[in-house]
Amino acid sequence: ILGTLPFLATGKPIPAITDSLGNRIYNLNAITIISNPKWDSKLFEFPGSISYLNTGNLDEMNIRSVKDISTIVPNLFIPDYGSKLISSAYIRGIGSRINSPAVGLYVNNVPYLDKSTFDFDFIDIASIEVLKGPQGTLYGRNTMAGLVNIKTLSPLEKQGSKIKLSFGNYNLWGVAATTSQKLTDDFAFSINARYRQDDGYFKNEYTRQNSGSTRSGGGRVQLDWRVNRHWKLSFSGDYEGSDQQGYPYAGYDKTLKKTGSISYNDEASYRRDIFTSGLSTQYLHDRFIFTSTTG
């Protein structure tokens, strides 16, 4: 037996404030405007599926890396294979484990073409946009499944200094420090540094020590210069080095359907050093915007 249940949907009016002149003032919710060299539009007018995170979202949910995004963004999956060198991303089930990635990553309009660079620690992130579905028409290679677009905070827009400390079990601790200052009204810089370590979450029965430890650290410099009302220049350079022990693998017994203990005496490690830089030049005209990015 099929039936229907009628329901009534009602809208809640927006409260108005009347000023001294009798004018009615309405306070509306903020509208997020997406702006990059590819397109400019209101977030809800973007012709596709997109997830947007701002600085407040990242701090509230303790998002500290690209892998952490997949815990809250629907249809995005970034498995943790143990090493930062292996960071495969999947959107709607489409991705690549071995070859060129099917999900693109851009940081300040600079493409990260190799997925071995995807896993890095966040600091001073302004926003993250996850575009789902093919983006090759605008972004070209490595975007068959979608795109992750990351923007960092501009020192021209926000100044100050802060230090962030984190602690946990298994000797997990980290520190991050950043400062953003204006030298003039039109020139500003930001400098940050970060370090994080842990001793691993598994024990090697052979050595009687923890296995899978991680040590990573790096820094970032950004210079923003508003030359005049038409021209704007932005330069950024970022370095991150990471040193990880070999991932703690163990044998699997098909008969007992049980994973064995971790026990080996072979020394193994992963070492990764990444340096990225980018220079963005922007010309603002009354009728158009010209942007050139070199990275």
Model-flagged regions — what are they?
Residues 232, 236-275:
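Flexible loop and strand-edge segments within Gram-negative outer membrane beta-barrel domains
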Residues 130-131, 159-162, 202-207, 258-265:
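Extracytoplasmic loops and strand-loop junctions of Gram-negative outer membrane beta-barrel proteins
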Residues 160, 167-198, 206-244, 275:
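Transmembrane beta-barrel wall of Gram-negative outer-membrane proteins
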Residues 67-110:
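Extracytoplasmic beta-strand/coil segments of soluble accessory domains associated
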Residues 25-59, 87-88:
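N-terminal periplasmic "start-of-domain" segments of outer-membrane beta-barrel proteins
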Residues 66-69, 88-93, 106, 130, ...:
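N-terminal periplasmic accessory domains that precede
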Residues 118, 201-209, 246-253:
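Outer-membrane beta-barrel translocator domains and adjoining extracellular loop/strand segments
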Residues 108-134:
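Short acidic/polar hinge/loop motifs at secondary-structure boundaries
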